[in-house]
């Protein structure tokens, strides 16, 4: 028994010595750049972990759906990726071989979705230029004429925007925001003059509308990462809003003090003028701080 144990220990020691002599390639440039050269290593590691991790059962059920007939898994928002294309290509190749048809050429194909997206972007740009020159529009928007009587989000939009558009179908402001999120901006007619239009970007919309859309995203796709990001952004928004309200109250208080002083001191002495200048400087400083917070 003792000899058998000594023999096992001896084998383990020889294996350890053998492994210690092996050469293992050091980490490459990409590994070093990601994990060692990043200023915020914790955030980078979190992103990489989120990218490669497997979904739990609840998250997978909310993001994907199973086709019992084809025994395939697809995204609930309808978007297809490389995996879906590879499965479809393999199915077509097997069917062609079974039917005796020649293989498709070239072997490497560009998914049809790439061409459709490019054509859609070109068509949208063309229609946008045409609408800008001709003055056409609908409900303050410049978008495809096929959308008359329907929502702002077109049929060629991704499933994410379609789902959000269905939730906020009765809110025109959020419909405009969704259109701007998908296309970068939206052209709107000014109320004072219907012949004039202005370009509205995403950052021009009220913050509470953007947070409302984000809250709905966390409800439709309740991933842990989405919820954490939303909670952090909402907390920052509440802090800035509270500080902004406090500064506005300070401005009103300073203004009331100036008015009171002007009523009780009609003769502008040197001291009163100095105090008034000081109060006005304080008001200007607070107004600049308000402008910085709003930006």
Swiss-Prot record:
Respond yes or no to whether keyword Protease is given for this record. no
Positions the record marks as coiled coil are 223-295
BP GO annotations: attachment of spindle microtubules to kinetochore; cell division; mitotic sister chromatid biorientation; positive regulation of attachment of spindle microtubules to kinetochore; positive regulation of microtubule polymerization; protein transport along microtubule to mitotic spindle pole body
What is this protein's function per UniProt?
Component of the DASH complex that connects microtubules with kinetochores and couples microtubule depolymerisation to chromosome movement; it is involved in retrieving kinetochores to the spindle poles before their re-orientation on the spindle in early mitosis and allows microtubule depolymerization to pull chromosomes apart and resist detachment during anaphase.
Family from the record? Belongs to the DASH complex SPC34 family.
Q: Which Pfam families match?
A: DASH_Spc34
Its subunit composition reads:
Component of the DASH complex consisting of ASK1, DAD1, DAD2, DAD3, DAD4, DAM1, DUO1, HSK3, SPC19 and SPC34, with a stoichiometry of one copy of each subunit per complex. Multiple DASH complexes oligomerize to form a ring that encircles spindle microtubules and organizes the rod-like NDC80 complexes of the outer kinetochore. DASH complex oligomerization strengthens microtubule attachments. On cytoplasmic microtubules, DASH complexes appear to form patches instead of rings.
Of the GO CC terms on this record, one is: spindle microtubule
* Main subcellular location: nucleus
- Which positions carry Phosphothreonine? 199
**Keywords of this entry:** Cell cycle, Cell division, Centromere, Chromosome, Chromosome partition, Coiled coil, Cytoplasm, Cytoskeleton, Kinetochore, Microtubule, Mitosis, Nucleus, Phosphoprotein
| Subcellular compartments | Nucleus; Cytoplasm, Cytoskeleton, Spindle; Chromosome, Centromere, Kinetochore; Chromosome
Q: What is this protein called?
A: DASH complex subunit SPC34
């Amino acid at each position: 028994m003792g000899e058998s144990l000594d023999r096992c220990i001896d084998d383990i020691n020889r294996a350890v010595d053998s492994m210690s002599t092996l050469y293992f390639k050091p980490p490459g440039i990409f590994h070093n750049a990601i994990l060692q050269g990043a200023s915020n290593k914790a955030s980078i590691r979190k992103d990489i972990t989120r990218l490669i991790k497997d979904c739990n059962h609840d998250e997978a059920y909310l993001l994907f759906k199973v086709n019992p007939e084809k025994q395939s898994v697809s995204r609930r928002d309808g978007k297809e990726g490389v995996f879906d294309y590879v499965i479809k290509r393999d199915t077509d190749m097997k069917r062609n071989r079974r039917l005796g048809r020649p293989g498709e050429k070239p072997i490497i194909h560009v998914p049809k979705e790439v061409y459709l997206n490019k054509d859609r972007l070109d068509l949208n740009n063309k229609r946008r230029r045409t609408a800008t020159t001709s003055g056409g529009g609908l409900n303050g928007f410049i978008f495809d004429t096929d959308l008359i009587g329907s929502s702002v989000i077109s049929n060629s939009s991704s499933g994410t925007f379609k789902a959000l558009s269905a939730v906020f179908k009765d809110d025109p402001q959020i419909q405009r925001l969704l259109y701007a999120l998908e296309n970068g901006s939206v052209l709107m007619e000014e109320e004072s003059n219907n012949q004039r239009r202005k370009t509205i970007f995403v950052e021009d919309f009220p913050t509470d509308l953007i947070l409302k859309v984000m809250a709905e995203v966390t409800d439709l796709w309740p991933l842990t990462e989405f919820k954490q990001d939303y909670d952090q952004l909402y907390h920052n928004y509440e802090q800035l809003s509270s500080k902004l309200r406090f500064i506005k109250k300070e401005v009103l208080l300073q203004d009331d003090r100036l008015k009171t002083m002007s009523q009780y001191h009609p003769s502008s002495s040197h001291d009163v003028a100095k105090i008034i200048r000081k109060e006005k400087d304080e008001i200007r400083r607070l107004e600049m701080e308000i402008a910085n917070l709003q930006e």
